[in-house]
């Protein structure tokens, strides 16, 4: 099963003041070790750079160079994919939108779900419970204690 990574594990791994910092770093080290196919969609990457460098969100925000460098390292791994929207993407997004009727902060999640469907990805590593609203998505919490 291929999976996608949502923005929050990336953010927790970059925020040393977070109680989830160590768990997020450990999770990303596991992702980096491979060999499972992992998707990092462009909206997730852009959200990471936007939030990780924002001084009102992070007490010690990353520089743009640091944030971009973190993603560059992740994207350089042979088992990490970053496809964009296919030419028929709007049809896929429309189906997702008709199922969930996203508004506000749920719109970016619907975008990610549509990208997942377009690329045959069924699972997402996230700490965001909103993904449970989408049918057919296996929500995987990287911080769940097993």
What is each stretch, according to the model?
Residues 1-40, 55-69, 146:
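Short, well-structured N-terminal submotif of metal-dependent ribonuclease cores
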Residues 51:
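Conserved alpha-helical segments that form or flank metal/cofactor-binding pockets of metalloenzymes
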Residues 6, 109, 128:
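Acidic active-site catalytic centers that drive phospho-/nucleotidyl reactions
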Residues 61, 80-123:
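Active-site neighborhoods of divalent-metal-dependent phosphate/nucleic-acid chemistry enzymes
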Residues 39-43, 126-127:
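Short beta-strand segments at enzyme active-site cores
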Residues 2, 113-114, 118-146:
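Acidic, PIN/NYN-like endoribonuclease modules and their adjacent C-terminal/linker elements
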Residues 34-35, 77, 134:
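Structured helix-beta-strand junction loops
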């Amino acid at each position: 099963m291929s999976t996608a990574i949502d923005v929050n594990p990336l953010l927790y791994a970059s925020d040393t003041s977070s109680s989830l910092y160590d768990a997020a770093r450990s999770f990303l080290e596991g992702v980096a070790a491979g060999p499972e196919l992992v998707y990092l969609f462009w909206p997730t990457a852009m959200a990471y750079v936007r939030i990780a460098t924002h001084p009102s969100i992070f007490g010690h925000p990353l520089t743009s160079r640091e944030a971009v460098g973190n993603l560059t390292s992740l994207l350089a791994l042979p088992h990490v994919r970053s496809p964009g929207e296919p030419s028929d993407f709007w049809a896929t997004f429309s189906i997702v939108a008709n199922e969930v009727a996203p508004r506000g902060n749920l719109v970016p999640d619907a975008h990610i779900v549509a990208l997942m469907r377009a690329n045959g990805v069924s699972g997402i590593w996230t700490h965001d419970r909103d993904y449970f609203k989408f049918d057919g998505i296996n929500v995987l919490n990287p911080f769940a204690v097993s």
